[in-house]
Amino acid sequence: GEFRGGTKFRNGDTLLAKITPCLENGKTAFVNCLQEDEIGFGSTEFIVLRAKENIDERFLYYLSISPEFRKQAISLMEGTSGRKRVNENALKISDFLIPDFEEQKKIANILSAIDDKISLNNQINQELEAMAKTLYDYWFVQFDFPDQNGKPYKSSGGKMVYHPELKREIPEGWGVEKLEDLGTIVGGSTPTKSISDNFTKGGEGYSWITPNDLSNNKGNKFIKNGEIDVTVRGLKDASLKLYPEGTVLMSSRAPVGYLAIATKELTTNQGFKSFIPDKKYDKNYIYYTLQNCLKVIEQNASGSTFKEISATVLKDIKILQPNLEIVKKFEIKVSSINNYIRDNEVQNQELTQLRDWLLPMLINGQVKVE
């Protein structure tokens, strides 16, 4: 196609969002996905940073995500509230301390090694998650779970019967139930925001999750903390209850259907309908069943400004009732996969903290690379 206008970029460039709130939120990317000599085109709402002679491309990227650079860029924003942009000309003449080229490469090598490990863990987790999803689909959608002889049930001629409520054939002996049968469905609420003592940060309070936290957590399956915690006073103010580790969180509005599994005791705001695995199923089966039902859940959401699924409607959505022995076998198989995914996510959080701790000290020369 033909491109008219926009911003051009190539491999090795750094793309820096220049409009609020993307700049403040750290929206920056290093380009390494194009073919050789291929040119990319994009919006005019980002700045292309291209390394000059004696500037390492990767060092320039890490400089652009450093707190010092970010603070300077934010201070140069102009315009009306909500539509502010960085003054590019002012940014161009800003001064930053730059080490010699060899030091730049050493700094970039250290930080890149951390990011490469994070990327590898993410890739492994994507493949593991695809395996778990495929297993669920194979057993509970295609009905090729292992029969008594260890062969795929439906493909090997296992008896199927038509179920009028589900309007499809299911394995003999299986039935229908409702989403509320997966586990106890719970909601949440928000403490009075004008009372500052209701909230705290830095892990000093109780984890309080919002749909925005799940959005920021996208790509991860598990969640431990949100951006803000609530205090004991906050819990009482909003009559919040703490939900156990293993609770499956599902955002019920703005948007509907973000999922995560709690790795510690926590609570949520009112944007959730979460499932406590206190009945016959564990967190793994609940998670994949909800994931499989998301289209139906979204279709049952209502609202003009934004869609929301109510607890009353959600709990009555009909789902397949499987054989519990098959479910238990599935849960055992998937549990080991999910443990691996969780370990990788924890390692990535630790690596991210290490990178963010090292970054400013390496950039400003507080720490030297030998």
Mark where each language-model region is.
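DNA target-recognition domains and sequence-specific DNA-contacting regions of bacterial/archaeal
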Residues: 1-98, 147-162, 168-322
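Hydrophobic transmembrane-helix microenvironments that flank and shape a buried ionizable site
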Residues: 10, 42, 113, 134, ...
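Alpha-helical scaffold segments that mediate packing/assembly in large oligomeric complexes
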Residues: 134, 138-154
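Short small-residue beta-strand/loop micro-motif enriched in glycine and branched aliphatics
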Residues: 268, 328-329
